Amino acid sequence: VALKDPAIDMDLKLNTNDIGFKEILSLIPAIYATEFSSLKTDGTATLTATAKGILQGDTVPAFNIDMQVKNAMFRYPALLAGVDQINISANVQNPGGNIDLTTVNINPFSFRLAGNPFSLTATVKTPISDPDFKAEAKGVLNLGMIKQVYPLGDIELNGTIDADMQMSGRLSSIEKEEYERIQASGTIGLTG
């Protein structure tokens, strides 16, 4: 890292060895603040990141961030169930220059909540000016089961989301109610 007032010229690399999934969960305030010491976890995660170039004003260096979570799980011992088979492959990259050139890819983010599998894939481009997205979701989420895997206190959740859908388009099309410009297929069912 070189300070070239008013810019910063950087050439950074980060590569973690396998780290425990509990260390990743500790970064999520809602989980860390709720009986974190008793939380049982398994699975590993890796993180690699690079950044090379100039950071000045609206100009960003080229960067690439990869996160992998493999076969992870968490469970609060006082609760009936847990979340397992957690797998995440995520990448955020930018060729440098404009932050709006950033691309986010998540393929997959999958898990099993109290025995029900759910998976999501997503890609987002031009996240600042007009997010261009493509997403796919498949699985069943029984919202009432969340209380069995996470201590919600007095909060009650009910209902089921059953999804097998794909969607792509731009946020501006939704904001302008130009729904014909959004590509969508599949089904999503909401009950309860």
Where are these regions (language model features)?
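Membrane-proximal interfacial segments on either side of biological membranes
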Residues: 1-109, 116-192
